[in-house]
Amino acid sequence: MKNILPLLFISSSKLMRQKTTITSAVRIALTRYHVCMLAALTFFLLTILSNAEVNAKGAAMHPEEQINFVKQQLKNKKEPYVKAFKMLIKKADSSFHVSHHAVEDFGVPGFYQDKEGHQRLSLGLQRDGISAYSCALAWKFTGKKKYAERALYFLNSWATVNKKYSQLDGSLVMSYSGTTLMIAADLLKDYKNWTTPDRESFNLWTRNVFRHAANSIRFRNNNSGDWSRLASLLANAFLDDQEDFQEDVRLIKKDFFNKIAEDGHMVEEVKREGNGIWYTYFSLAPLTASMWVIYNESGENLFFMEKNGASVKKALDYLLYYNQHPQEWKYFKNPRVGTVNSQYGFWPANLLDAMSNIYDSNDYRQYVAPYRPLMYVQHDYAWTFPTLLPLSLDGYKEIK
């Protein structure tokens, strides 16, 4: 018995030491686990906060940094902002004298099959859209309730009346003319008097009609695809549908270097005979606007993508040169060019005005300088108020 007790004591001591060792190991493992979980949780929260910060900057097309920058210029009575702002307010005020043109079936025949019918049936959406857009911006700058309410009048009209789109160009026109409704809605997101039922109604219309129209043609590799992707991006930003938003981004990247040649010409658009320069603009305007929306929503910068010399900058330079030297355009004799007297507005000046700060281009600035402030308020809506609302990739630290 005397011999057994020491052995039991020794065994018990070993067991206690082993138990202590095991307990320590478990504690270390649990500590490491908690540290890892805490790190993962921290990363997750930071990601959410980071995304929230991006979205908190404001609308997809007009981030708060941009709005605040312009407010400061207006406060300082700086031109051309003051004059451009007066033009905006005049446009917004004109919306109080017109009724909405929403229709149950937005049916638009093909332009080349029925030009008169196409233009007539498109005009209602174009007038309502620019009215909503200009009023939403006017509210953003002035805080006056009447502008927000007038913008909502047009948004609610389309959300409750319009149920579908049809005919050959219904989806395309809704994409390039209806962008204004989406931008207006995005600007009004923080308007407290936009009731929940009305918001839900507009969300439903955006998802089932507007975005459906855009997504039905976003696979196209020409200007139609460019406009429909912009429309879809704006809808997805408003709906906070990140999955479909990323699908738009994927499509833009997928055919980017198929549509822009190494010398800068737009492969599909120069085929349009006498309208080749116009369609070059008509493709680049929504493409660059899409890049701006992507940058504002995700922080991803696509403006400087380049491959074998092909880039958006080169395409813009190409457009500017041949709009000034149409006699050198090799694809068609006497092509249509954009001027200050153009039917819808001064294209491509509105586009080049918008891009002048993105690419810090004195050529673009010199081209548009005599005509500023520019406003493009008919037909197609990517760069509508380029002088009033300049773009910046550096937080508006340097605007020329």
Predicted features along the sequence, with ranges:
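Glycine-centered signal
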Residues: 10, 14-15, 49
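Bacterial N-terminal signal peptides that target proteins for export
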Residues: 4-7, 15-38
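Long, repeat-rich segments with strong aromatic
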Residues: 239, 243-327
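Bacterial N-terminal signal peptides
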Residues: 36-48
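Extracellular glycan-targeting catalytic surfaces
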Residues: 52-220, 226, 250, 293-298, ...
